[in-house]
């Protein structure tokens, strides 16, 4: 059990830190949602690639479940969308939903294709 928890936890620490750093790197002139969008899109692409190229169970736990699971964030996306709705910005909320959902699905698919090609 500990042999699974350790790689999972290490991946989660670095994934969460990467998401936080991405949010800090977003210029103040852009929407606060931009950092999470970039994290979700990057994570979606890379999770597809690594799902196809990593076979060792411990590395899958560290990278896919730990790192990319904590890099990408449904809770941040949900908060941003609800905040936009509460700010009476329904068009921005719908755009946020579309960009996160469609972009993440497309990039995961692309990542799987890339992973298959390099395998």
Swiss-Prot record:
The yes or no answer to whether the keyword Transmembrane is present is: yes
Q: Which residues constitute the signal peptide according to the record?
A: none
Q: Which GO terms describe its biological process?
A: cellular detoxification of fluoride
Recorded topology in the membrane? Multi-pass membrane protein
Q: Which reaction does it catalyse?
A: fluoride(in) = fluoride(out)
Which keywords, in A-to-Z order, does the entry hold? Cell inner membrane, Cell membrane, Ion channel, Ion transport, Membrane, Metal-binding, Sodium, Transmembrane, Transmembrane helix, Transport
Q: Transmembrane ranges?
A: 5-25, 30-50, 59-79, 92-112
One GO cellular component term noted in the UniProt record for this chain: plasma membrane
This entry's Gene Ontology molecular function terms read:
fluoride channel activity; metal ion binding
Q: How is its activity regulated?
A: Na(+) is not transported, but it plays an essential structural role and its presence is essential for fluoride channel function.
Q: Where does Na(+) bind?
A: 69, 72
Q: Where in the cell is it found?
A: Cell inner membrane
Family, according to the entry, reads as follows: Belongs to the fluoride channel Fluc/FEX (TC 1.A.43) family.
Give the protein's biological function: Fluoride-specific ion channel. Important for reducing fluoride concentration in the cell, thus reducing its toxicity.
List the PANTHER family hit by this protein, alphabetically. FLUORIDE EXPORT PROTEIN 1-RELATED
Entry protein name: Fluoride-specific ion channel FluC
């Amino acid at each position: 059990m500990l042999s699974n928890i350790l790689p999972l936890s290490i991946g989660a620490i670095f994934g969460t830190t990467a998401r936080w750093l991405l949010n800090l790197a977003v210029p103040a002139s852009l929407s606060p949602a931009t950092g999470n969008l970039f994290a979700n899109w990057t994570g979606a692409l890379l999770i597809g690639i690594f799902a196809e190229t990593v076979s060792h169970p411990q590395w899958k736990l560290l990278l896919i479940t730990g790192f990319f699971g904590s890099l990408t964030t449904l809770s941040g996306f949900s908060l941003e969308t609800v905040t936009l709705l509460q700010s009476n910005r329904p068009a921005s909320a719908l755009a946020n939903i579309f960009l996160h959902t469609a972009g993440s699905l497309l990039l995961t698919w692309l990542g799987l294709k890339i992973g298959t090609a390099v395998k």
